[in-house]
UniProtKB/Swiss-Prot annotation:
Compartments (UniProt record): Cell membrane
Signal peptide: 1-23
Broad class of the protein's primary localization: membrane
Pfam families cross-referenced by the UniProt entry: COX2, COX_ARM
Matches recorded under CDD domains: CuRO_UO_II
Residues that span the membrane, as ranges: 46-66, 87-107
Name of the featured protein: Ubiquinol oxidase subunit 2
Mode of membrane association: Multi-pass membrane protein
Protein EC: 1.10.3.-
Residues anchoring lipid (N-palmitoyl cysteine): 24
Any one of the GO BP annotations: ATP synthesis coupled electron transport
Keyword Magnesium: no
Covalent lipidation (S-diacylglycerol cysteine), chain numbering: 24
Length: 307
C-alpha cells in the first residue's frame, strides 16, 4: 500500500513539473537576430554531438542490465576477461573526436560572434549608438546622437546594427537580451561593448543575468524592435517629456530603486563618460586614440565622484 502511494505521488509530481515547465519560454532557442541565430546553432550542434555519446551509453547500460540479469542463465560468463582493443578504441576514440569537434566549432563561433566585432549592415544603413548604464536596480539607456535617455525601455530600428557601450554605476551586472544574442558584463569604471541586430519587429525582454541585490529579480527592460519611421516617432515621443538628465538630476535616478519606464527629453553631453570616470580618478578612455583623457571637473564634482 505504501509503495503504491509513493508511486502515485511520484507520478503526480512528475506530471506537475512537466506542466509547470511547459509554461517556460526558451527565448535563447527562438532568436530574432543573426547573433542569436549563431548562438542557437552552436547550442543545437553541441547538444547533438554530445548525444552521440550519451544515447549509446544509456542504451548499452540498459542492454547490459537485461542481458546479464540473474534469471538469464544462458548469458556467457567470462570471469577472466580483462581487455578489448575494440572497446578501448571506441570508448576513448569517439569522445576524443567529439571533444575535438566541439573545440573547433566553439572556437570558430566565439570569434565570429565576438561581441566587440561590428556587424555587417545593408548599404547606407548607419549603426545606432546606445550607451547603457546598470544601476540599482534598473537600466539607463542613453542615445547620444539623439540627445535623449530612457529607463527600462530600449527602442531600436529593425535591421540596423546597434553598437552598445556598457558600464555600471554600482556592482557588476550582466546585460542580456536573450532573443537577440550575446550577454556581456557591465562593470563600474569600465566600458564593455556589444553589437546586436534585430531582424524582426517585436517586444523582446532584456534582463540582468547577475545577482545584484534585493531588486535584481525585477531588473528587466523591454526592447522594442520597430521600423525606422516608428523609431523616429518614438524618439519624438521621448523628446516631448518634461524630464531632463544632467549632473543635478542623475544622483536621484542612480539611488537604489525599482523604476518604471521613464523618459528624458535631454541628456547632458558626456554623461556616460562622466559616470565611467567616477571610478577612474576622473579619467576615461578615448575610443579614437585609446588614451586616457580627463573628464570635466565640474561635472565630476556635481555627481559626487566616488573613490
Amino acid at each position: 500500500m505504501k509503495n503504491k502511494l509513493l508511486a502515485r505521488v511520484a507520478r503526480l509530481g512528475g506530471l506537475s513539473s512537466a506542466l509547470l515547465l511547459a509554461g517556460c519560454e526558451l527565448d535563447v532557442l527562438d532568436p530574432k537576430g543573426p547573433v542569436g541565430e549563431g548562438v542557437k546553432t552552436l547550442i543545437a550542434t553541441s547538444t547533438v554531438a554530445m548525444l552521440i555519446v550519451v544515447i549509446p551509453t544509456i542504451l548499452e547500460t540498459l542492454l547490459f542490465a537485461w542481458q546479464y540479469r540473474q534469471s538469464n542463465t544462458s548469458a556467457e560468463y567470462l570471469p577472466k576477461w580483462c581487455h578489448s582493443n575494440k572497446i578501448e578504441v571506441t570508448i576513448w576514440g569517439v569522445p576524443s573526436l567529439i571533444i575535438l569537434f566541439l573545440a573547433v566549432i566553439t572556437y570558430q563561433t566565439c570569434h565570429s560572434l565576438d561581441p566587440y566585432k561590428p556587424l555587417e549592415a545593408e548599404a547606407n544603413t548607419k549603426p545606432l549608438h546606445v550607451e547603457v548604464v546598470a544601476l540599482d536596480w534598473k537600466w539607463l539607456f542613453i542615445y547620444p546622437e539623439q540627445g535623449i535617455a530612457t529607463v527600462n525601455q530600449l527602442a531600436i530600428p529593425v535591421n540596423t546594427p546597434i553598437d552598445f557601450n556598457i558600464t555600471s554605476d554600482s556592482v557588476m551586472n550582466s546585460f542580456f537580451i536573450p532573443r537577440l544574442g550575446s550577454m556581456i558584463y557591465a562593470m563600474a569604471g569600465m566600458q564593455t561593448q556589444l553589437h546586436l541586430l534585430a531582424s524582426e519587429p517585436g517586444d523582446y525582454l532584456g534582463e540582468s543575468a547577475n545577482y545584484s541585490g534585493r531588486g535584481f529579480s525585477d531588473m528587466k527592460f523591454h526592447t522594442l524592435a520597430v521600423s525606422g519611421d516608428e523609431f523616429n516617432a518614438w524618439v519624438e515621443k521621448v523628446k516631448s517629456s518634461s524630464e531632463q538628465l544632467d549632473s543635478q538630476t542623475y544622483p536621484k535616478l542612480a539611488a537604489p530603486s525599482e523604476n518604471p519606464v521613464e523618459y528624458f527629453a535631454h541628456v547632458e553631453p558626456g554623461m556616460f563618460n562622466t559616470i565611467v570616470a567616477k571610478y577612474n580618478n576622473g579619467m576615461v578612455m578615448d575610443k579614437s586614440t585609446g588614451k586616457m583623457i580627463q573628464v570635466q571637473q565640474s561635472a565630476m564634482s556635481d555627481m559626487n565622484m566616488k573613490e
